[in-house]
Amino acid sequence: MNPLSLYILTFNCARNLVDVNRFANHFFDARPLNDPSPPDLIVLSVQELAPIAYAFLGGSYLNPYFSSLKDVVNQAVAQRWDIDYVNLVTDNSGMTGLMVFARSDVAERVSSVDTARIGFGFQEMGNKGAVGARLAYATEGTPDGSIDLTFVAAHLAPMESAVEQRNDDWRSVVERLVFERPVATARGSLEPDDQETSGLLHGSTSNGGDDRRGIFFSNSYLFIAGDLNYRTSNVSPGQEDLARFPRLNADPADPRHYSQLLKDDQLTREMRQSRSFHGMTEAPIGFPPTYKYTLAAQKAAAQGEGPRSGRGQAPVGPAGATYDSLPLFPTSDHRAVALSVAVPIVASRPVDATHVSAPFPIDPDWQRKRDTARQREIVPSGYWAHGSCFDRCGTLDEALQRIRSRMETAVP
């Protein structure tokens, strides 16, 4: 079979609706110029998808944000090809979202979709977190008749000094991002189990063995994309650092060339020391940092004067790929980063010395932690969105009931 072509894009939306026209015009900027064919799968990882209250409440509160991103994909595709895509996955863990689209002729080969969510922000809530989707892709000549592709959207802890926290976030992903059951097929979009919990860390039943429920297992491709927040320095920049701020036109040997920053890149260091993202690889970085842009730069971008090509976000996957940033958009202080890659469809990938085992076992308490985080999210988000409070609502159950009632009639 021909390789499966993927286009994976990650973007921190800064809690704003995206500019559909501007985003669509540049959505495929990271695609190879000599490849006119549309990708088989498009994966969109978004962070700070919406204001925190809307993200925690989910449901209709997130519909405008996901709809605008879907419009971006549809418009970008229509500008290049006369073909349709099927939205297989639209899901989130708090403020982190994941969307998966399959080309219409490819969608029929996706036999099942499984999802998982985790929060590792404050008290394990979803202000920081990850959401994953696992697709079973039907193949010819493979022992099981399919291969699995796992996509994870993640937003890790910020700040230069928080390297250990980011490593702990990665460990949480391995231990508690648990896939449970097929919940959709290629013929329809994955929808949350119910509107009340769509923005939260959903609860449900478990099945199967742990070897296939975690993100690591044999005969599977794993891609992680997000605002991973690993920096190129262990300390925040000071005034004296302005002189060595990356220059696009600097010679590669010049200390001000962006490639010099990568010598102190935290993610590269932590991966080499087997402290984070065990067994993963990242395509070579050929673009300057994508964060953080000033308000003046965002205003310039709105007038078409912003930088045209800038890593705070990193799709992590196989080498031999096109890996680049998109222009700055006026709605965010981050720039989108995209990976265009083709993965081989092989009859079997035997477990050997190259197989990566899970660096940590699945947390046996993962479901209780997820359910607890769910309760922590919905009450404060209901307070922020509707003015609810414990003093007026009484018990937690009464608070939840009152928030649900208001959600049924409120229009965000």
Residue ranges and their predicted role:
Residues S388, R392-P412:
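C-terminal single-pass membrane-anchor helix
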Residues C13-N16, E48-P51, N92-G94, S104-E108, ...:
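Conserved beta-strand elements of beta-rich interaction domains across eukaryotes
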Residues Q75-I83, S161, Q165-G394:
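Catalytic lobes of large eukaryotic enzymes
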Residues L49-M159:
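Structured beta-strand-rich core segments of catalytic domains in phosphoester-bond hydrolases
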Residues M1-R31, G119-G121, K128, A385, ...:
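N-terminal charged/capping segments associated with class I S-adenosyl-L-methionine
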Residues R31-D35, D40, V86-D91, F120-E124, ...:
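Beta-strand elements of modular eukaryotic interaction domains
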Residues N2-L9, P38-I42, D84, M95-G97, ...:
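Core residues of folded domains in eukaryotic genome-function proteins
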